[in-house]
């Protein structure tokens, strides 16, 4: 029986949920995600090269936008500049010999706006000096930033080679413009979106199968069992991933992003701890294909034998509703041109004004899982993020809205963290951020047929 102290704690800590509290089998109303097959490798290469050419065509405009006349990138095999991966052809698996690129904002005398070399002799430097002498760029950007990976990919040894190769006369014209690398990598051309949406649907479909009675056997399956099932499932579909899937049992303790000091005492993903009836489980999961990466976090609930949606603890459903509200808050504050730190500040102020406790840690995604762009909070940095948080939010990119809300669950007599992560894209038609596939608004339910003599406990 729920005592008066527990009830009072619930009333003080609970967030008012205006919508009707429900739970269903699916993740989002009206959506039944299906695995989307990838095209042949040859067709994938055509798609990739087409997207790359679209993006390369944007470079002269980027140079003009940031007031730079030329952009020079150079790398050796297995020591690539980070931006190299946004420029390479689909059938290139690394740089070769010395791979060098020069881009010009406004070439003179009908010259091309870009040049590339794959060379292991002095020819590259001789020809490069000739082009620079003809074009006379006043500024030449190099990717030498010390804090931003997408603007700091020029290796130290290669920088020495560049300075020696082009000569001291050009050294004074070298400049650092970090937004060149950031914006080039961040920009997602429109033709990529349909495939990104298919990839996201596939990720949802794998999660829904993994968090179902098809895969989870209560009392037997462990979190690690489900993680490796997900990994094998990805591989079987000819997709890959950019991180190991994780599955956590949300007990109210031990969730890493919550910085809970009791984590060592209550490991939510201990390999020998089976998933049990009544568990609230969470996954962080992504798939990779076609030079793109997804990033998703969903939660599910393990019903007791014979239970239905109506038996899900209401506090858990309310927790999901609360984190949905936090998603709305962050998405509405993501104004193009604002810095990540400004968005973080506005979002946290609104979050607290609505009585929500949680954390916000959003990042760009797409080309890389943690891709180029501003950062909106980190799990350990909720006031501001140095350097990365000071970058402006760009349009025409993808973002992972990653966060959690805390909610007191009276049926467990404890506060539980409710994490969520969904990807969004910039939509020019609505001038706003839209979910790539959707967002989780209903708990995933793991069902078990009724067992004679077994009933769910009334108190946990």
Language-model features, listed with the residues they occupy:
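Fungal secretory targeting signals
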Residues: 1-20
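Active-site neighborhoods and metal-handling regions in enzymes and metal-associated proteins
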Residues: 20-460
